[in-house]
Swiss-Prot record:
Cellular component aspect of the GO annotation: cytosol
Protein name: D-fructose 1,6-bisphosphatase class 2/sedoheptulose 1,7-bisphosphatase
NCBIfam families: glpX
Organism: Prochlorococcus marinus (strain MIT 9515)
Family: Belongs to the FBPase class 2 family.
Domain of life of the native organism: Bacteria
């Protein structure tokens, strides 16, 4: 992996975001996702690399492109593994709600955990709390620790939690401690990363979301120096989702074992989910969000707002890009 790859990866998420944004608010979540997938795949194909999708749009027989195991890039150059979500928050995009973005994580070959399409209990917190809060603790204990780490009273803390029935008890406990809840309907990657930056108004992410997105969040938090832990959830009664109606707890354990995951209750740290020597996170807003704006279409240009975090050069780049149209006559600042 090299410096040139950072710019290339930025352009990958920008193009995916633009493609999805054209369908924002139209109620067409599947079409928005498909547009982002196609745009991301097309731009990836132009990169000089031996790329491979390790987390993507599903198995080979489930997705036409960006499927797990698909080779991307020119076939020459450095080996790069990708975890991608071309339109994270498809419902958010379809309904023109905040928080949808095109997102990916990249690392050296073998550097990203090949997460199953399961759920994951997650804990994200700022760099000041890294290694101090712990997913094994109760929410109450972690809020006390976080309060000390950030020198804030508990009633000054805001915790992001997915608005799901499974989190009823968690939300109750957090509020009884005096902390505030910021519920989100979808898309916990941006919420997790926002915890790593001061000034976003959010201090912690707790609760259960999708495991593949957990790997992307972990990559970003590792590069940022923030705290992230994840634990796979294999019990459908805990996840409380109809998507697992055909699976039993025993069946899910069998699936994990078949994937080579025998320590099914393992707590994964950020540097285990994103273990490569080099790690890059890139996200570009489709709709406005906690970290950056969504795509803006203007008469003579299209504007994107993005974030790239890289261990290659220890940088966080917030990037506003103007994509000029042919024959553009006037570009506003």
């Amino acid at each position: 992996m090299n410096q040139t790859l950072i710019q290339e990866i930025l352009e990958v998420v920008e193009q995916a975001a633009i493609a999805s944004a054209k369908l924002t608010g139209l109620g067409q979540k599947d079409e928005a996702d498909a547009a982002a997938v196609e745009a991301m795949r097309l731009r990836m194909g132009k990169i000089e690399m031996k790329g491979k999708i390790v987390i993507g749009e599903g198995e080979r027989d489930e997705a036409p492109m960006l499927y797990i195991g698909e080779e991307v890039g020119s076939g020459n150059g450095p080996g790069v593994d990708f975890a991608v979500d071309p339109c994270e928050g498809t419902n958010l995009c379809a309904n023109n709600q905040r928080g949808s973005m095109a997102v990916l994580a990249a690392s050296d070959t073998g550097g990203l955990f090949n997460a199953p399409d399961f759920y994951m209990n997650k804990l994200a917190a700022p760099p000041a709390a890294k290694g101090k809060v712990d997913i094994r603790n109760s929410a109450t204990e972690n809020l006390k620790i976080l309060s000390n780490c950030l020198d804030l009273a508990i009633d000054e803390l805001t915790v992001v939690v997915m608005d799901r029935a499974r989190h009823k008890g968690l939300i109750k406990e957090i509020r009884e401690c005096g902390a505030k809840i910021q519920p989100i309907s979808d898309g916990d990657v941006q919420a997790a990363i926002a915890c790593g930056f001061a000034g976003t108004g959010t201090h912690c992410l707790m609760g259960i979301g999708a495991a593949p997105e957990g790997v992307i969040s972990a990559a970003a938090m590792r590069a940022l120096g923030g705290h992230f832990q994840g634990q796979l959830v294999y019990d459908p009664s805990i996840a409380q989702t109809s998507e697992w109606a055909d699976y039993t707890k025993e069946g899910n354990i069998k699936r994990l074992n078949e994937m080579g995951i025998t320590d099914i209750d393992k707590i994964y740290e950020a540097n285990e989910l994103a273990s490569g020597e080099n790690v890059i996170f890139a996200g570009s807003g489709i709709t406005d969000g906690l970290l950056f704006d969504g795509v803006k279409f203007e008469k003579d240009c299209t504007r994107t707002s993005s974030l790239v975090i890289s261990t290659l050069d220890s940088t966080c780049r917030f990037t506003n890009t103007i994509h000029m149209k042919d024959g553009a006559k006037s570009i506003n600042l």
